[in-house]
Amino acid sequence: MIASHMIACLFTELNQNQVQKVDQFLYHMRLSDETLLEISRRFRKEMEKGLGATTHPTAAVKMLPTFVRSTPDGTEHGEFLALDLGGTNFRVLRVRVTDNGLQRVEMENQIYAIPEDIMRGSGTQLFDHIAECLANFMDKLQIKEKKLPLGFTFSFPCHQTKLDESFLVSWTKGFKSSGVEGRDVVDLIRKAIQRRGDFDIDIVAVVNDTVGTMMTCGYDDQNCEIGLIVGTGSNACYMEEMRHIDMVEGDEGRMCINMEWGAFGDDGTLNDIRTEFDREIDMGSLNPGKQLFEKMISGMYMGELVRLILVKMAKAELLFQGKLSPELLTTGSFETKDVSDIEEDKDGIEKAYQILMRLGLNPLQEDCVATHRICQIVSTRSASLCAATLAAVLWRIKENKGEERLRSTIGVDGSVYKKHPHFAKRLHKAVRRLVPDCDVRFLRSEDGSGKGAAMVTAVAYRLADQHRARQKTLESLKLSHEQLLEVKRRMKVEMEQGLSKETHAVAPVKMLPTYVCATPDGTEKGDFLALDLGGTNFRVLLVRVRNGKRRGVEMHNKIYSIPQEVMHGTGEELFDHIVQCIADFLEYMGMKGVSLPLGFTFSFPCQQNSLDQSILLKWTKGFKASGCEGEDVVTLLKEAIHRREEFDLDVVAVVNDTVGTMMTCGYEDPHCEVGLIVGTGSNACYMEEMRNVELVDGEEGRMCVNMEWGAFGDNGCLDDLRTVFDVAVDELSLNPGKQRFEKMISGMYLGEIVRNILIDFTKRGLLFRGRISERLKTRGIFETKFLSQIESDCLALLQVRAILRHLGLESTCDDSIIVKEVCTVVARRAAQLCGAGMAAVVDKIRENRGLDNLKVTVGVDGTLYKLHPHFAKVMHETVRDLAPKCDVSFLESEDGSGKGAALITAVACRIREAGQR
């Protein structure tokens, strides 16, 4: 008993000595995590070089675009063919994908051989043979009469220019068919099929095996965005942001990049990591200096690396008592399968003994232990190097997405990964150590790259079908030149109706006289008070207008809030509160007791009977002060001033915010005769000839008309242009049937139109994977500011996704593109409709004056116009297009409607003084 224990201890000690001896000899092959992180950093730099337009030609890691723009989302369905060509045998598959609540993939396939004389014959012979095998397969399945979509896995070096266009760079794997290199392989297959004439197929996609692996696994796990192959060769692919792929136009969405990572190090970046054994393997290979990384990790070279180490250690008399055999000295005699067998847990040492005996050696126990350790070090290095480059890919995806923690799946195939007893486990552990902030799942591809080619095709078909369905819906929101001209014509008709005494009562576009009869001429001067009331806060302003050399406007203002109990109390309480705030402001400005002319911007629906008289028709915006509706707001204000008996004010003018905008801009530009607001709401005003304003006596001069154009279409004249989404938004609004034009163009409603379209798309499975979140059902979540942010040119889809996430909407990259497109279409239509309305206004001014050409400026305010990245540009283009005889400039109002009220007051005072003289 004691003797056997001593023998066991002796053996253990001998084994440990052998392991230490090997570890020392192969010190440079045992890579620390620090070294692996350095390799990962270098690989990230190589990835960037491959993606960059200027650095791509000289980059070792080529980062080739595959034109695969999306991974499966589980809703794919249909019947597809796949062709898998990458060696002396090739497979033809029929893949049926069903999506009836249960994802299912059914496959039938047949393997066909390619005789050597065809491999080395002409390209025509090769592709005719492939077409013949395809015909044979379709005959067997009795599907020749169908025109099925086909995906083609073509595992040779190619230059891909489209999803269905791939030019062979060079043959490998023993193929030498003439007349194929430099040609599009898809075109060659199509021509071979046409030559037969007995069937037809639709070749949708050509991919390599790595992409096929990612797509196969992507169907089972929608987080799969990386494909990895570690077999005879090694490569990886992943989904990259389009904005980083300089070789392909466009910066929205993602595209799968075929990395061709086997060439990492071909430019010398791994020289300090490569060992003498790596250099020897490279020197003896068919392609010296090429695919250096692949030669360190793939199955084609792993066994040979072990053989070279055994030879070197034997020569150094560290193994086999210094003896060599002819078999051990024969290149390729130690296979990668031998490495896997020796590393088996159960009988690895026994397997080592058998393999070494096969190689003509007479190994001792310690030789077998040493060989086992050599295999372990070589395969561990391979897994570690793979992990380092994968870590770089994961880090890049994480950076691209801007996530603190990435959750991702890697689809894997290849004999080394699948058959080596420990490779997969070592790879997984190393990846998790190198990128601890990534939750990585590894998913084995069980069905090969043929299924992957079919999945690429299925995804392409799904995307095309969904795109067609979405475009059909969005088409109803896209307006042609003729439709916009018709909107302009109808607006002009409605304007005439509103101006006419006979039809004014029934006209939706009310064309209200404002009694503002002139715009600033630059001679205005004096101090004026302005009051700007249009919400829960209001402003009191002191506006100092100077003329002559010191011409300009100086403003001081203070914002006051209106408590809810005052908003809902009596009219007296409301106007007493306003006067109290005016008194406070005058004291604040050191002007207590001073009497000044006052302009009053009052942004509620009113009927104006003179410049200083405005009857409140109804409260809006949450105001409910009693005793005000039907009363003149100027009188109510004056009565409150008299009750206070502290100061007196000369209320000269009461205006709405649109007129205020025109007057503010009119002070800067004498050509400004139109005011436009496109913000939460929308309205316009312009200077009309008095002879056309039938509601006011007098024929001479001009008067500003407040169009109240938001009600355009309330009589049904826009019904043919309104979509189901416009109708839905209108029906659920606070004022159904009212302000229909405003609901198609203003910021308050555009987000709701977008939300309704997104719900429709989601219900039809065209967005958010068909899952409607509670958040999406919430009215009002899409504020105008989000539309503006989403459409911003400088905003990447990453930020669009962040905005959607903030709204509680989990989206894919494809979803983000769709949401952005919907926002673009809705905002563009709004800008075009606004432009059509404005074209009607400026053309009317031109016709009023009998001019061939009109030069006019439009003063504009409103958040949608100012903050949306494209609204203003599209609106300007539309006006130019629809009113070619008008030279229209647009001037943004910078100081709001309060300054405008003061300027109207200043103009009125100027005219009044001139009349007195």
Curated annotation (Swiss-Prot):
EC number(s) reported in the record: 2.7.1.1
Presence of keyword Repeat: yes
Residue stretches making up the Hexokinase domain: 16-458, 464-906
Region feature (Hexokinase large subdomain 2): 656-895
GO biological process: apoptotic mitochondrial changes; canonical glycolysis; carbohydrate phosphorylation; cellular response to leukemia inhibitory factor; establishment of protein localization to mitochondrion; fructose 6-phosphate metabolic process; glucose 6-phosphate metabolic process; glucose catabolic process
Catalytic function, reaction form: a D-hexose + ATP = a D-hexose 6-phosphate + ADP + H(+); D-fructose + ATP = D-fructose 6-phosphate + ADP + H(+); D-glucose + ATP = D-glucose 6-phosphate + ADP + H(+)
Segments of this protein annotated with the region Mitochondrial-binding peptide (MBP): 1-16
Subunit field text: Monomer. Interacts with TIGAR; the interaction increases hexokinase activity in a hypoxia- and HIF1A-dependent manner.
Protein name: Hexokinase-2
Organism the protein comes from: Rattus norvegicus (Rat)
Name of encoding gene: Hk2
